[in-house]
Amino acid sequence: DFFKDSFDVVYIASPNSLHFSQAKIALSAGKHVILEKPAVTQPQEWQELVQTAKDNKCFIFEAARNYHEDAFATIKDFLADKQILGADFNYAKYSSKMPNLLAGDTPNVFSDRFAGGALMDLGIYTLYAAVRLFGKPTHATYQAQKLDNSIDLNGDGILSYPNYQVHIKAGKNITSNLPCEIYTTDGTLTLDTIEHVSSAIFTDHQGNEVQLPIQQAPHTMTEEVAAFANMIKQADRTL
C-alpha cells in the first residue's frame, strides 16, 4: 500500500544489508530511489538494481553526498594543470554507539548481519573523494582492526594509481583531527575535511598560500539533492 501512493522518490536509510531488497521493491513499483551510502554490499546487487531501474524507467542514486559538492569541482579544476604525487584522506570519528558496543551490545553500525563498519560508514567518503578527483584506482588494499565478527573498527587503505598512491583512513572507535592533503609537484593542497569541505588552501614550496574559492552549501545535502533532482528532470543518466 505504501508504494501505491503518488510520491515520486523514496529515500532508503535502513541498515546497509537491507538496501538491496528494499530498493528493488521500490523500483519495481515505479519509484525513483535514493539509497543511503553504501548503496549495496555487493557489486552484483548494484548491477541488478540499475537494470531494475531501467526496466521501470526509474532512477536510482547513491547518497554519497561529498561526490556532488561544488567544492570538489573547484578542487578538481584547480588540480587540472598539476602533476599529482599522492594524497592522504582520512575520516575517523568516535561513534556515539561505541558505549553500547563496549557494554556488550552489537549496534547495527557494528553488526556483520547489517554490513556495518568503519569503511562502509565513514571510509566511503574518502573513497568517493579519490574517485571524484583522480578516477578509478588500479589496485586497492585495506588493513583493519576488527571485531570478532570481522567488522572493522578502523583501518588504513592504499589506492594505487599509475604514478602515485592515495592513503585513506577510516575509524569509528577513534577520532582524527588531521586535515586531508593532496600532494603535487608545485606544492600541497590542504582540505579541512573530506566529507563537507569548507576550506582548501594551496601552499607552494616557497610557503606562498592560495585560498580556493570554496562556497559551502548551507546544508550538507543541498548539492546532492539538487543534482538528483536535475538528473530526474532532465532524464540525464550520466555523472
Task: Give the positions of each predicted feature.
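Rossmann-fold dehydrogenase core element
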Residues: 47-65, 84-87
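C-terminal helical cap and adjacent loop that interface with cofactors, partners, or active-site loops
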Residues: 208-239
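A general structural signal for well-ordered alpha-helical segments in protein cores
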Residues: 19, 46, 72, 126-127, ...
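Contiguous beta-strand/loop segments that form the cofactor/metal-binding neighborhood of enzyme cores
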Residues: 126-197, 225-235
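Short strand-turn motif at the edge of the Rossmann-like AdoMet-binding core
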Residues: 37-38, 63-66, 91
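Hydrophobic residues in well-ordered beta-strands that form the structural core
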Residues: 35-36, 60-62, 191
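Beta-loop-alpha module in the N-terminal Rossmann-like domain of NAD(P)-dependent dehydrogenases
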Residues: 1-52
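Predominantly a Rossmann-like dinucleotide-binding segment in NAD(P)-dependent oxidoreductases
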Residues: 69-138
